[in-house]
Amino acid sequence: MKPIRLELREFGPYKHEVIQWNEIINEPMFLITGKTGSGKSTLFDAFVYALYNKTTSGKDIASLRTKTADDKNRTIVIFDFELQGKHYRIERTLAYLKTGNKNLTSGKVCLMEINAGIETILATKENDVKEKVEQIIGLDDKQFCQIIILPQGKFKEFLLSNSNEKKEVLRSLFNTHFYQKFVDKLQNFAKTLDSNYKLKERELATKFEKFDFE
């Protein structure tokens, strides 16, 4: 996945920020630096929030809204990215509680594909967006954080995770599901052959019992 553009409005410490990732992403290596609390980790939270409506640390997404945001301003993340030659955009608006209101102002989400400047909406409902994002990227939110983000302090957690969890993450990373399916088919075929062989063996034994060789 190649990030193209990230726009943040009332998100964490960012009142309104636009980052053109395509201007630096082709560099062999780049570094995001800044003082503690300046918003470095918030950028990765923005990726995860936009795609999965989650945070990298599992904290409440309501905490992503800028503390000093005016009630009339919505918290919005717009994330453009490229994958397998296709340009996608996901725009997500955070639900929030206005001062004096008892009910939340609802959030919104829209996933679209952009081709030659033409926007095609792929999904606008939360469950549909979740399913489509996982289909496009090939990872759920937990796998995305482990493989793409790997938040601070989580590397040790990944190393200490059980074998099955590691296996699933590495399968997703190296896209080896096809080979696993092939292995499963071979194993099932081998079991079928073995069952047929044993069946024929029993049938032959039964037939030989009918003969008297004395």
Residue ranges of predicted features:
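Extended, Lys/Glu-rich alpha-helical coiled-coil stalks
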Residues: 31, 49, 118, 124, ...
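Extreme N-terminal "head/tail" segments of very large remodeling/mechanoenzyme assemblies
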Residues: 1-131, 141-143
